[in-house]
């Protein structure tokens, strides 16, 4: 049976083959909705709704694998990466996940700054909104001191706000239900080009945050499972799968509300038309943000709130801003816990949540303040969209390790991935990697100066090299013996680095 843990956990033998190794005590669980819509993807038509649907399905598959790994082995993904990957790939992998966490926190800072700007009718400048996010950091830590239940209640409150606010926008916009269903279940995108590719990659990055895969593998450890009994392990896996399905369904509905509203409001809308709509509304002061030309409106989270207010009244703008604020606060909570688990798992370095959130927020605020002070709103909102793409680009560094270790029978025993699961997840992962690679190649010609090519080339080599290494070890774990090198037999036989080196030394 699954039950809440007592403060002191009694060590007992686990069902997974590596679970008898020492593991840090699990932390309290902040929330189980780890993939909930923390970022808002905004395409301008319903053509990409099918990307949202399948990204959510992929998110469920990833969350299922992460939970199963944690339940069976008693260890999170970061800890198992520490056991099996050599030092250099392990450090590089840790850095990529830390980059994803900082990128996610930057999005929280951007969303919060824009929401304060909208709620104050522009009286709070963007840089002021960025600095205000320091306060919400301490508010989160304040709640954390009052225990897990208070934190979960606050997270539930944020989720409710998001559902109500974005649901309100959906009702007042009244999008076409026929177009909605067609966009969801008929994968197509006629006439799409690089902007739509950017949106599609951003949707995947907004739905599946790489660090959340590491987080969810750790959260399941906050429940006591008797790993000596196969029935209890199987029951726990089903329990967490059901829980993840419910959470992702809520996430999907919230994202669907947002994307459907903007597909309705912005489809084939020109900047001139948007300017005229706002100029003839009670929010005429905002009309100047739209250039007076015939180009199609390029929607971001700031312009999105403005045009909603111009079309449906000021209430729609303020409700959008409140929903944006709630989405940002949920990101702070999950990012803090993910950062702590990742640091402890990869580096065996224990920091307090206060120190961890202070480090992450400091790294996120500096570049965001610089953009807010020296650039304009469009650059800040555009930065948010690029950060969504960054999350998608970093996704292989979470999905490839989880596919590797959940496919190793020596680690997962009878709960290792079956052949059908391996084929489906591997094909999806190959597709994601191919799309990311195509995006990187197509993005190169748009670089503002040739001097950037050298830096981008170095980053691309490092990115492709680490991805290739992770894919190689994943193939070994899937049974490709012909790829096995003597130094990496652990991925075939499930021997942690220390144990393999010990055997080689004694031999």
From Swiss-Prot:
UniProt-annotated glycosylation sites, renumbered to this chain: 280, 294
A cellular-component GO term for this protein: plasma membrane
Task: List the stretches on the Cytoplasmic face of the membrane.
Answer: 1-39, 145-152, 221-245, 327-353, 413-422, 473-507
* UniProtKB keywords: Endosome, Glycoprotein, Ion transport, Iron, Iron transport, Lysosome, Membrane, Transmembrane, Transmembrane helix, Transport
**Biological function:** Macrophage-specific antiporter that fluxes metal ions in either direction against a proton gradient. Localized to late endosomal lysosomal membranes, delivers bivalent cations from the cytosol into these acidic compartments where they may directly affect antimicrobial activity. Involved in iron metabolism and host natural resistance to infection with intracellular parasites.
The record's NCBIfam families line, in alphabetical order, gives: nramp (TIGR01197), Nramp_1 (NF037982)
Q: What does the similarity note say?
A: Belongs to the NRAMP family.
Query: What is the name of the protein in this document?
Result: Natural resistance-associated macrophage protein 1
Which species is this record about?
Answer: Rattus norvegicus
């Amino acid at each position: 049976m699954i039950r809440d843990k007592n403060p002191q956990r009694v060590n007992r033998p686990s069902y997974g083959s590596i679970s008898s190794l020492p593991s840090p005590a699990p932390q309290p669980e902040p929330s189980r909705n780890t993939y909930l819509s923390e970022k808002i993807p905004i395409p301008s038509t319903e053509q990409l709704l099918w990307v949202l649907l399948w990204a959510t399905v992929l998110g469920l598959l990833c969350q299922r694998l992460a939970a199963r790994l944690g339940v069976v082995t008693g260890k999170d993904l970061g800890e198992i990466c520490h056991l099996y990957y050599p030092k250099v790939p392990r450090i590089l992998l840790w850095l990529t996940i830390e980059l994803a966490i900082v990128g996610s926190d930057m999005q929280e800072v951007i969303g919060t700054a824009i929401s304060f700007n909208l709620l104050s009718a522009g009286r709070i400048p963007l840089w002021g909104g960025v600095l205000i996010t320091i306060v919400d950091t301490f508010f989160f830590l304040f709640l954390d001191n009052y225990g897990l239940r208070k934190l979960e209640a606050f997270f539930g409150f944020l989720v409710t706000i998001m559902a109500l606010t974005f649901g309100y926008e959906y009702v007042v916009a009244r999008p076409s239900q026929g177009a909605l269903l067609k966009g969801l279940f008929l994968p197509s995108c006629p006439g799409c080009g690089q902007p739509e590719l950017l949106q599609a990659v951003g949707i995947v990055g907004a739905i599946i945050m790489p660090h959340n895969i590491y987080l969810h593998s750790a959260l399941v450890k906050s429940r006591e499972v008797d790993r000596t009994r196969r029935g209890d392990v199987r029951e726990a896996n089903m329990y967490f799968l059901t829980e993840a399905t419910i959470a992702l369904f809520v996430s999907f509905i919230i994202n669907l509300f947002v994307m459907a509203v903007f597909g309705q409001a912005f489809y084939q809308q020109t900047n001139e038309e948007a300017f005229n709509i706002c100029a003839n509304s009670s929010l005429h002061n905002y009309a100047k943000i739209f250039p007076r030309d015939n180009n199609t409106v390029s929607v971001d989270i700031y312009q999105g709130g403005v045009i909603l207010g111009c079309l449906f009244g000021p209430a729609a703008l303020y409700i959008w801003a409140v929903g944006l604020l709630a989405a940002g606060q949920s990101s702070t909570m999950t990012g803090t816990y993910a950062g702590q688990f990742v640091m402890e798992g990869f580096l065996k370095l224990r920091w307090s949540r206060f120190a961890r959130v202070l480090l992450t927020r400091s790294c996120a605020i500096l570049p965001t303040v610089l953009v807010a002070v020296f650039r304009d709103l469009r650059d800040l909102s555009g930065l948010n969209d690029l950060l969504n793409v960054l999350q998608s680009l970093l996704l292989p560094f979470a999905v490839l390790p989880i596919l590797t270790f959940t496919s190793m029978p020596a680690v997962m025993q009878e709960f290792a991935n079956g052949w059908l699961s391996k084929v489906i997840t591997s094909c999806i992962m190959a597709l994601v990697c191919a799309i990311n690679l195509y995006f990187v190649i197509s993005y190169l010609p748009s670089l503002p100066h040739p001097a950037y090519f050298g830096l981008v080339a170095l980053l691309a080599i490092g990115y492709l090299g680490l991805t290739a290494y992770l894919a190689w070890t994943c193939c070994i774990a899937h049974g490709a013996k012909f790829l096995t090198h003597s130094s990496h037999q652990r991925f075939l036989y499930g021997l942690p680095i220390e144990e393999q080196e010990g055997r080689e030394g004694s031999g």
